[in-house]
Amino acid sequence: MTITVGHRSLRVATPGNMLLGLIAAFHMLLAAALLAVLLAVSSAQAADDTCTGKNLMTELQQNDPARYAEVVKEADATPNGKGIFWKIEKPGLKTSWLLGSMHVTDPRVLNLPLYAQAARDGADTIVIESDEILSEKKAAAALLSRPDLTMFTDGTTIEKLLSREDYARLGAGLQRRGIPLSAVSRMRPWMIASAVALPACEISRKAKGIPFLDQKIAADAAAEGKQVRGLETLAEQLQAMAELPVEFHLKSLIETLELGSKMNDVVETMTDLYLSGDIGMTIPMLKTVSPDGKDEESDYASFEQRIILDRNKIMAERAAPILASGNVFMAVGALHLPGDGGVIELLRKQGFTVTQVN
């Protein structure tokens, strides 16, 4: 697909791959922290906490059983693609635990399974992606510390990058979420897309101060006097996103706007898959949402490498010395767990035995 930025026409990745990139970004703590900044300047807030999305996999199973079977087959072939809670062991160390999290405020997600809650309660140390989320001020400071990474500093505005139709669609989408268009006019497309991708009900809960899962885990632990450690900084997440081409993020934003209310269905389906532990089905499911196509310029491959795989390595490397103390409860985004390059396999390569807790 070709889009125009300024006077340049550029070829960008196909719809399916771009949506995968957007949803992967949705799983970054950075996107969750961003909302605190946006909502702080919002003059209006969405009032309804009720999410109205439907499960796309249920619909697919009914309408296209063959395609559904393909999705299940691909998910089953994903290493460590089943389960969100894992036990980490090593001779001479107390058992530690790994939870795949989802950075949302959905009460179904916040309600940890009893065995996971018991492990969290009994742990000496809590590890999350970034401990900066314990303070909204620190999170906001991290986001604003490098304005060139989050904002256009050369006079560019989002209005100049979008068609009149897409710009109007963006304004309407933000208004439904209680975010004024003026608040994001100079923000980079990926910053805006992170907010637009979330259902209005999620925005509403965040506006009311309801924490997302990782934030709640960390806050509860800090209140109990437990040590809370982070594996990366929000600035590092910021840098990773900013290193990808603006055209990539602009296309993600446009596609999010085009999906409209269907994004509610996508997020609801992701949530259902998370709650059932079918993490390996997330990416195959997303491929059914957008049209098929080839990624001629390998944009998604670059995204996956920089945002998922590279960060997996950082998380596993930095977690190892903390896990060496034993009795650790670690929570990172669930999409970081599965696959040959996932956190689970990387921890195994460091000598840990990691097994699923049923």
Q: For each predicted feature, which ranges?
A:
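Bacterial N-terminal signal peptides
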Residues: G16-N17, G21-A40
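Structured, acidic catalytic/metal-binding patches in enzyme active sites
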Residues: A47-F303
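Intrinsically disordered, low-complexity segments
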Residues: H7, A40-V41
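Sec/Tat signal peptide C-region and signal peptidase I cleavage site
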Residues: S42-A46
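N-terminal secretory signal peptides that target proteins for export/translocation
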Residues: M1-A24
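C-terminal soluble interaction/assembly domains
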Residues: A301, Q305-N358
